[in-house]
């Protein structure tokens, strides 16, 4: 059975930063996450919302500002499937960055898709 000095539950912004700092201080550290590294904000909240807002600003500029710059825009079609893929790629890239930060600081990542075993001992 593995033994750690610190086990951080949750790999959101508070969790992964705490785990990295503990590891930097020389503690054998693990982080436990159920769904995705980076937490809700990075994966389904703030970041995906801001990615979509950025895309909508791009669309608005193409329609309203481009003609003032001399571009003749006849029409723009939105491929919502591709837009969703792009948004997901933004989130995946950032989540991958969190993973690299954790690995680079020697934090053990434990992805657990079920509840923790109640017989685990935390001292």
Residue ranges and their predicted role:
Residues 2-3, 20-27, 32-123:
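Glycine-rich flavin
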Residues 1-14:
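Beta1/beta-strand and adjacent pyrophosphate-binding region of the FAD-binding site
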